Amino acid sequence: MKNNLRYGIRKHKLGAASVFLGTMIVVGMGQDKEAAASEQKTTTVEENGNSATDNKTSETQTTATNVNHIEETQSYNATVTEQPSNATQVTTEEAPKAVQAPQTAQPANIETVKEEVVKEEAKPQVKETTQSQDNSGDQRQVDLTPKKATQNQVAETQVEVAQPRTASESKPRVTRSADVAEAKEASNAKVETGTDVTSKVTVEIGSIEGHNNTNKVEPHAGQRAVLKYKLKFENGLHQGDYFDFTLSNNVNTHGVSTARKVPEIKNGSVVMATGEVLEGGKIRYTFTNDIEDKVDVTAELEINLFIDPKTVQTNGNQTITSTLNEEQTSKELDVKYKDGIGNYYANLNGSIETFNKANNRFSHVAFIKPNNGKTTSVTVTGTLMKGSNQNGNQPKVRIFEYLGNNEDIAKSVYANTTDTSKFKEVTSNMSGNLNLQNNGSYSLNIENLDKTYVVHYDGEYLNGTDEVDFRTQMVGHPEQLYKYYYDRGYTLTWDNGLVLYSNKANGNGKNGPIIQNNKFEYKEDTIKETLTGQYDKNLVTTVEEEYDSSTLDIDYHTAIDGGGGYVDGYIETIEETDSSAIDIDYHTAVDSEAGHVGGYTESSEESNPIDFEESTHENSKHHADVVEYEEDTNPGGGQVTTESNLVEFDEESTKGIVTGAVSDHTTVEDTKEYTTESNLIELVDELPEEHGQAQGPVEEITENNHHISHSGLGTENGHGNYDVIEEIEENSHVDIKSELGYEGGQNSGNQSFEEDTEEDKPKYEQGGNIVDIDFDSVPQIHGQNKGNQSFEEDTEKDKPKYEHGGNIIDIDFDSVPHIHGFNKHTEIIEEDTNKDKPSYQFGGHNSVDFEEDTLPKVSGQNEGQQTIEEDTTPPIVPPTPPTPEVPSEPETPTPPTPEVPSEPETPTPPTPEVPSEPETPTPPTPEVPAEPGKPVPPAKEEPKKPSKPVEQGKVVTPVIEINEKVKAVAPTKKPQSKKSELPETGGEESTNKGMLFGGLFSILGLALLRRNKKNHKA
C-alpha cells in the first residue's frame, strides 16, 4: 500500500513535470522564432538620417519586407532626381571594404540599396531604399508600396549610391532594406514625371517698376527694378508640375551674388513651389506635394531685377521684359551709372564685381584713368574699412593695362580681363611696386600715370561681420613747371559698400473638391514685412542670397557724408541668420484720482512692418559706387515673408519719455533708459492726495516679507478697493521714488512721528553695484496741534541685508504722510522698515522689486482708533492653476523650515500675523524669478506638497527608480540587433524539431497523469 502510494506520487510528479517542461519548450521555440524574424528584418527610422538595417537569411525561409512600417510612420511619395554618378560604393558584411561598381549594373546580386541625397542643409530625414536604375536628369517618383519576396536570399550585400541633387530641392533622404526579389520588382514601380503647366497659368496682374515706382534705375546707388506678378492657376495641379517665365538678358536676379536663387512660393509657412534659375534668363517654379487636391490656387511674386553690367555698359534707356505663357510684361527704364570721382588730372572709379558669402570672399575692379597733364608719384591703395580680417590671408591683386580708348571704358565698371585685345596684364612688371597685407589691403606705386590701369582685387572679409566697406584711394602729384608747386598733391577716394535686398513670394489655395457646407479653406496669412531705408552713403552695393528656413536680422546704420573730397560713412547690411529675438518695451501708467490704473501700454515687435527709407547718395557732392548684392530674394522697399516670424533689430540704446496727467493735472515724467547690459530703469510715481477727518490713530504697517517693496498711502475717497502697481524686472535695477498723500485738518491729540534714516535701512545687494536711494521722510505738518509734538529718528542699524549677486542697494522710503485734520486722539504713523528682517540671498542674476499701493481708500469721519495695515503677502488662493512650472525651479525643494508646509490649510491669513512671523516668507523667496508676474508662489505650490517634509523624498524616489530601470532595460535591446550574424537563428528545421520535442513531452506528461488517475481509482 505504501509502495503504491509512493509510486503514484512519483508518477504524478513526473507527469506534471513533463507537461510543464513541454509547455516551456513550445513557448520558448515560439519566442525564438519571433526573435529570428526580428533579426531577419530590423529597420529603424531616425531623424538625423542614420539608419540601422540588419538582415539575416537562411536557405529555405522566404521573407517579406517591412516597408509598410515606414509608410505608417510617414506616408508620402519621395521625389528624387537621379544624375549620372561614378561614385558607387559597394560594401559587404563579410568583407567590409569598398568595391567600385557601375551604377547601371544588373541587380542580380544586389540585396540592399541605399540612396543618399546630398543636401545643403541638414534636415529631419526619413529613410527608404530604391533600386538603382538608369541615370536620368528628369525627376521621378518612387512608390513606397511594400513588395513581397518570392526568391531565397543570397549572400548579403549592401550597395550605397550617393547621388547629387540640385540646390533648389529639399527632399528627405530615404533608406530601405530589401532582398533580391524586391530589387527586381522595383523596376515596375510607378514613375511620374512633372508636367509643364505654364499654359495653365493666367497672369492677372504683371508689372515692372523702377526704383521707388519711378522710371529710373541707378545701379551704382544700389537701385534695382522689381517684377511683380499675380498669377492664377487652373485646377488639377500635382506634385512635380512646373511653370516657367523668361527675363530679358539685360537684367538678372542675383546682382553680384554668386548664388543663383529665387524665392519659394509659400502659403504662410507651407512651401507650395520651389524656384530655380535656369540658363537664358529662364525662371522655373516646381510645385511640391502641398499642391495636391488644391483648387483656386493663386500666387504673388515680387522678384528683384538687377541691371546686368556686362550687357548694359553705358547710360541710356533699357527695355526690360518678362514673358509668361506668351504674355509679355515690359517696362522702359532709364539706366544711369556714376562716373566715379575725379579732377582735372585723373579719374578714379570702382565697383564690387562678385560677392561670395559662403566663402567670405569678394572681388573688386578699379579703373585709374589719367585726364590731362602728367601725374607723377602716384600711389593707389585698397583697404577694407569695414569687415577686415586682421589674421586673414593676403589678397590676390592683378594689374592690367587698358589698350582701348578711354572713351570706350564701360560706365558700368565692367572689365573682361580675358579679352587680350583690350587688356594686357602687367602684374609681373609691377611686382616690385605692389605691396600686399594680411588684413586684405594692398598698395601700388606708379611712377608716371600716363596710361589707364585696371586693378582687379580678390580677397576675403571677416566672417560674421555686418558691414563690408572697401575703399580705393589714389594720391598723385601733377607735374609742375616750377618745383615750388611740386608739393601740391591731390587725393581721390572711392568707397564701395553693400546693401542686401530680399525677394518675396506667396500663394494660397482651397482644398478640393469643394463639398457643400464645407467651409474649410487652405489659407494661411502670409506675414509681410515692408523694408524701406535711406542710405546717405555714396557707394552702396546690393547683394541677394536666400537661405532656407531662416529669419531676418537687420542691422542698420545711418550713413554720414564726410568732407575732404570723399564720402565716408557706414554701410547698411540686411542679412539672414537663424537666430532671432523680440524686444518688448512697456510702460505702466500712473494712478489717477479715482484710484484705478490709468492705462497700460505695451509695444512689442514681432513680424510687424519695419519701415526705413532708402536713398543712397542723393544730393552728394562726390559719388560712390554701388554693387548689387541680394539676400533672401525679397525686394527692399517691398515685403518679406519669414517662417519663424521673428525680426531682430540691433540698436545702440533707446531712450524714451512717457508723460501722463494725474488728478491734479500735474505732469509726471516716467523716464526710462534701456540698455543692453545694465537694464537700468528709473521710475518716479506720485500718488494722489488724501482728504478727510481721521479722529482715531492712523497706523500704517508695511511688511516687506520676501519681496523688496514699499507702499504709500492711497487716496481716501470712500472707496474700499485696492490699487496695486507692480514693477517686475528681471536682471535689472529699479529705483523707486514715492511721495505719500497728505491729510488736511486740525490735530487735537499728541502727534508722534518716526523717521527712519539711511543708517537703519536694509541693504540690497545686486551685481556689485551699490545704489543709495534717499527719500524725503520728514513729514510736513499743518494745522492746530494741541498735543505734544515728538519726532523720533531711527538710524540705520541692525537692519538686514538683502544679497542679490554682490550688489548693495540702500532704499529709504518716504513713509510719513502729511497730516492735516481734526484728530482728537493720539495719532501714530508707523512704518515697519524691515527691522530685524531675515536675510535673503539670491543667485545674483534675477531680482524682483514690487511697488504696491495696497491701502484702502477711506473717506469720512472715524470715531475710533484707526489702524491701516498692509500685508504684501497676497492671500492664499488654493485653486490657482499654474503650479506645474514652480517645481521646475531647482531651488524649490530648499525650504529649511517646516513652518511653510504646516500652514497651507489657512484660507486667509489675518493681517496681524504678517509682522509677527517675519521668517515665514523665507522659503518661497527663490521662486520669485520663476514667476515674475505672479507673486503668490507659496500659495500655489503648497496645496500639492505633502504636509510632511519627509514625504517629499518619497515622491522623488520613484523617478530615480524608473530611470534606473530604463537604463537596465536599454542594454538588453542592443545585443538582440547585433546577433544578426548567427547563421542558424530563425531556421525552420531547428524550430520544428524543438516544438515537436516539446509536444512529445507534453503528451507523455498527460499520459502519465491519466495513468495516475486510473491507479487511484483502482
From Swiss-Prot:
Residues 1-36 form the signal peptide. Residues 745-878 are annotated as: 4 X approximate tandem repeats. Residues 875-938 have a biased composition (Pro residues). Keywords: Cell adhesion, Cell wall, Peptidoglycan-anchor, Repeat, Secreted, Signal, Virulence. B- repeats lie at residues 545-574, 575-604. The keyword Metal-binding does not apply. Pfam families: Big_8 (PF17961), Fn_bind (PF02986), Gram_pos_anchor (PF00746), SdrG_C_C (PF10425), YSIRK_signal (PF04650). Residues 194-511 are annotated as: Fibrinogen/elastin/tropoelastin-binding. Residues 38-61, 78-195, 595-622, 740-813, 827-997 are annotated as: Disordered. SUPFAM superfamilies: Bacterial adhesins. One of its GO terms (biological process) is cell adhesion. Disruption phenotype: In a double fnbA-fnbB deletion, cells adhere to host (green monkey kidney Vero E6 cells) but cannot invade them. Residues 879-948 are annotated as: 5 X tandem repeats, Pro-rich (WR). Its main location: secreted. Residues 986-1018 form a propeptide. WR repeats lie at residues 879-892, 893-906, 907-920, 921-934, 935-948. The modification Pentaglycyl murein peptidoglycan amidated threonine is found at T985. Residues 545-604 are annotated as: 2 X approximate tandem repeats. One of its GO terms (cellular component) is extracellular region. PANTHER family: PAXILLIN-RELATED. This is Fibronectin-binding protein A. It comes from Staphylococcus aureus (strain USA300). The gene is fnbA.
